[in-house]
Amino acid sequence: MGKVGWSDLHEDLIDLLANNLSSNINLLRFRSICKPWRSTVATKKRLHNHFERNLPTFKKKKTVVSPSTFFRVTLPSPCRNKGWLIKNRQVSESSKNNLLSPLSGKTITPSDKTLDLLKVECFRDSSILQLFADSDRVVFLDNVFFVVDFKNEIWCCKSGEETRHWTRINNEEAKGFLDIILHKGKIYALDLTGAIWWISLSELSIYQYGPSTPVDFYEIDNCKEKRLVEYCGELCVVHRFYKKFCVKRVLTERTVCFKVYKMDKNLVEWVEVSSLGDKALIVATDNCFLVLASEYYGCLENAIYFNDREDVSVFKLDDCSIITKQINSSSSSSHQSCFQMFSTSFF
């Protein structure tokens, strides 16, 4: 049997491949392979992961779910193995896109230059639940959206036009949920106690997957955020700790510490991760993921990058210190060079 060229693939196979793409950028890459693929795959009708639905929590307002993609941008230079981190959001079913800050999700002020997203490395897709604060926890699987809303409830809805019905996924033993993640083809959620739950797609039911992550009694009031992240192929839980400070006679909360936990399968208990090795953890508004530090300008190994109110900061696991990016400071200075990966100097 002879070899089949890319342009000779059957339309049904091309159709199947296109339906598994999760962002418009990936779809554009796919259509650019050859002319038959471009004519077979229509752009607009493929974007199933962008839709408007009235989430029960907001009965009178539309909930807009739109896909977003994280990119690693590199340019021809002596350091071609290093790049910058940027985020792209598809704001409509047309080709319109916004470039966002990877951590805060805020729109980056456009310049007179353009960035060809087909020539940069796409390494992670996610979705953003727009319009409502604290509702950025969204995953997409098998044409179904799963959302954690601001009331810590999980809802799911098919992305097709055949239904606009949201279904709540609930378990009486769980008091509420904080995060949700797609891991190895399955959906997992994190409850308020730091326990992981597994969602059955066939039953649309949820079952506890493991015990709660440990929090010392004196830390309970300060641990106000928990997130899920995949590390070394396993699910881990990230705890974020806050403390109140008086700044100019105003009481404000600031991040003071992070802890990362992984499951010890032999002991069947959570153990604290002492080092992330050569990786850095990115805690974004809608996603948590790890990157190889050596692939990004200034990126610190064994560190956690996060947004604290209006500030971009990094927490170093080796000495538990925090460096905050100074407003209007140059990321090229020695103290601020660890934030170069978020610079848009490539424009």
Swiss-Prot record:
Disulfide bonds: none annotated. Residues 4-51 form the F-box domain. InterPro entries: KIB1-4_b-propeller, SCF_F-box_domain. This is Probable F-box protein At1g44080.
